[in-house]
């Protein structure tokens, strides 16, 4: 059924109205695409004041995300707003938060060339443009492996220069040679083509000096070419996509904010970290300062693609900055893009803590908590976002736990108790961990088991049916040797806990405690109740677990030799299979002679064995047609299996 034109227009108007776009962006201010759609709407209405305000808001939140600056600058350049462009360039290309991106620098070059017309400005204008090219070359182009377009533009500009006299001609030739010299010593795309272009140019310029100049540069070129091939392999899996302008921006080339619990693909993060590690090896044998500039450039490029990955920000901060003042500036920027990140929050709090700035430490934690609470309140009650809510509750609790411990360290127990007081008001927005953490904090710092026990008793009001909480409570009572309280907790909890995995652990814990510190009749009674609840559990498994010492099942180690799976695994493996059993079995198989190992379990899949069985024997081939090591490297580095892609 087709819709009428009126219906289509009404739907479009509804979907793209200013209010709808504003509400969409306000609901998720980390979604850059929502902001760009609103900017696109403003510009379609020639409402450039509002588009500028929104761009300014984005620059404030994401000052190191270069594509936003590039899109904004291009929009202003199209309308010849040179004063605005100049102010924007000063903001993004200088200062503590300077960007370093070739597309952004290319926009700067466009501005310089438009402002300095060679026809009207003559030699003075040319000098300004050449100075701008040199700046971009030193700041950015020598580090960028995809810089061939810049080098072509630079050389093209110099080749178009029509000298007025011999002195100018010689100056032009020297400049061209200097550019080639800089360019051919660094790894970048089309390096080989540029070398051929250079040798031809030298021969056309002066056949007498060509061999000398080419010879001087040859070794550096060969080294750069070799390193570029290596760099290609290192960066093969890296996806570098950025919008050319506002119209081409979409979800495929703009970073998307996703909660960590929904991040399934970390291949890009791993690929970028691999490139950074390779750069740090200094294959180009640069000076310490030059190496740092090059690695910093790659970090800033990684941020363009991994804006919402806290790890890349943390790595960058720890590499680039040696003092806490500089680190704080970048960590603040990182937290604006990742406002719920525990890693970045804790690191920034540390920077303030070493300066004994209690108020700044509190502000740091409170900002992260406020953002988590905002997200939690937005998502709470939506069944489709249940995994988000679980993550938000766990992260919120974790932040509060570290906040509480930090304030104890910084300002004493009363400050920590004040933080815990705030947590109690949040009730079900928190997990049980805050009560457990506070109980241990009270006990460790005051040796006060009464207050700690009261805290855990209070937690039962909210988590009385939480098997994990009951288990942790029992551990604490066991530590204090409060057997009677432990039994009371056990009896009042076993009917409330619905999670059978946790319930089984509660029973086993109580049986183990009675076995060590109680009496055997109580153990037998507990075992009877246990087997009524879990009739499929192997008798000897429970028996051997009961005789653990220092949490080590010696019966299995010394007598059962891991032939029986541990149904009541101490590590909480839902399968019940002892992971150490699996690990040792693999290790034992690897230590067997080849003949025995093949009989017990083939190392190769059946399909591979079938192929090997029909291949001709090696004695039929006099020469090697295939290098197996190269084939393995090729398969590892270049071939993606279907399962890996999914």
UniProtKB/Swiss-Prot annotation:
Organism name: Candida glabrata (strain ATCC 2001 / BCRC 20586 / JCM 3761 / NBRC 0622 / NRRL Y-65 / CBS 138)
HAT repeat ranges per the UniProt record: 46-78, 80-114, 128-160, 171-204, 249-281, 290-322
BP term (GO), one: mRNA 3'-end processing
PANTHER family xref list: CLEAVAGE STIMULATION FACTOR SUBUNIT 3, RNA CLEAVAGE STIMULATION FACTOR
One Pfam family cited in the UniProt record for this chain: Suf
Cross-referenced InterPro entries: HAT, Rna14-like, Suf, TPR-like_helical_dom_sf
Keywords, comma-separated and alphabetical: Cytoplasm, mRNA processing, Nucleus, Repeat
Protein's job: Component of the cleavage factor IA (CFIA) complex, which is involved in the endonucleolytic cleavage during polyadenylation-dependent pre-mRNA 3'-end formation.
Principal subcellular localisation of the protein: nucleus
Compartmental location: Nucleus; Cytoplasm
GO cellular component: cytosol; mitochondrion; mRNA cleavage stimulating factor complex
SMART domains: HAT
Record region (Disordered): 571-599
Protein name (record): mRNA 3'-end-processing protein RNA14
Molecular function GO labels: mRNA binding
């Amino acid at each position: 059924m087709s819709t009428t034109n009126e219906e289509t227009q009404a739907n479009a108007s509804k979907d793209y109205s200013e209010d709808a776009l504003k509400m969409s962006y306000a609901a998720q201010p980390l979604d850059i695409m929502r902001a760009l759609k609103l900017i696109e709407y403003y510009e379609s209405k020639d409402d450039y004041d509002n588009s500028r305000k929104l761009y300014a808001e984005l620059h404030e939140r994401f000052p190191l995300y270069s594509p936003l600056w590039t899109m904004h600058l291009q929009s202003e350049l199209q309308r010849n707003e040179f004063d605005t462009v100049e102010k924007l360039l000063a903001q993004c290309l200088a200062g503590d938060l300077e960007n370093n991106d070739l597309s952004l620098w290319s926009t700067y070059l466009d501005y310089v060339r438009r402002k300095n017309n060679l026809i009207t400005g003559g030699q003075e204008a040319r000098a300004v443009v050449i100075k701008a090219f040199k700046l971009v070359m030193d700041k950015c182009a020598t580090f960028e492996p995809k810089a061939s377009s810049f080098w072509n533009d630079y050389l093209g500009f110099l080749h178009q220069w029509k000298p007025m006299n011999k002195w100018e001609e010689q100056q032009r030739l020297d400049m061209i040679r200097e550019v080639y010299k800089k360019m051919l010593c660094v790894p970048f795309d089309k390096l080989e083509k540029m070398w051929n272009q250079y040798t031809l140019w030298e021969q056309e310029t002066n056949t007498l000096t060509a061999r000398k100049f080419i010879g001087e540069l040859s070794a550096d070129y060969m080294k750069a070419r070799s390193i570029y091939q290596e760099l290609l392999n290192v960066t093969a899996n890296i996806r570098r996509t950025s919008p050319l302008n506002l119209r081409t921006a979409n979800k495929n080339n703009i970073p998307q904010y996703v909660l960590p619990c929904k991040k399934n693909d970390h291949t890009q993060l791993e690929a970028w970290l691999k490139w950074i590690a390779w750069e740090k090896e200094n294959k180009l044998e640069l000076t310490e300062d030059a190496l740092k500039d090059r690695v910093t450039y790659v970090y800033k490029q990684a941020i363009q693609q991994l804006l919402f990955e806290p790890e890349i920000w943390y790595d960058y901060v720890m590499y680039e900055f040696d003092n806490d003042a500089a680190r704080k500036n970048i960590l603040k920027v990182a937290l604006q893009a990742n406002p719920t990140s525990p890693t970045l929050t804790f690191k920034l709090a540390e920077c303030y803590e070493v300066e004994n700035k209690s108020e700044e430490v509190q502000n740091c934690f409170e900002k992260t908590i406020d953002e988590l609470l905002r997200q939690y309140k937005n998502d709470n009650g939506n069944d489709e976002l249940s995994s988000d809510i679980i993550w938000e509750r766990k992260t919120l609790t974790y932040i509060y736990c570290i906040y509480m411990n930090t304030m104890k360290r910084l300002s004493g127990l009363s400050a920590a108790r004040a933080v815990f007081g705030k947590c109690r008001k949040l009730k079900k927005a928190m997990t049980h961990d805050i009560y457990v953490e506070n109980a241990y904090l009270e006990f460790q710092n005051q040796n006060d088991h009464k207050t700690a026990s009261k805290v855990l008793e209070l937690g039962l009001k909210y988590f009385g049916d939480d098997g994990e909480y009951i288990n942790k409570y029992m551990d604490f009572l066991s530590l204090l040797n409060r057997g009677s309280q432990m039994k009371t907790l056990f009896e009042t909890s076993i009917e409330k806990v619905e999670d059978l995995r946790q319930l089984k652990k509660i029973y086993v814990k109580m049986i183990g405690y009675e076995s060590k510190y109680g009496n055997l009749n109580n153990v037998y009674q507990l075992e009877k109740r246990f087997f009524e609840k879990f009739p499929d559990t192997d008798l000897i498994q429970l028996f051997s677990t009961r005789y653990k010492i220092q949490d080590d099942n010696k019966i299995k180690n010394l007598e059962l030799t891991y032939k029986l799976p541990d149904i009541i695994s101490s590590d909480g493996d839902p399968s019940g299979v002892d992971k150490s059993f699996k690990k040792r079995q693999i290790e034992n198989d690897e230590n067997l002679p080849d003949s025995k190992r093949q009989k017990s379990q083939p190392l190769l899949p059946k399909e591979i064995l079938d192929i090997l069985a029909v291949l001709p024997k090696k004695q039929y081939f006099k020469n090697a047609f295939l290098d197996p090591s190269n084939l393995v490297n090729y398969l590892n580095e270049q071939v993606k299996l279907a399962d890996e892609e999914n």
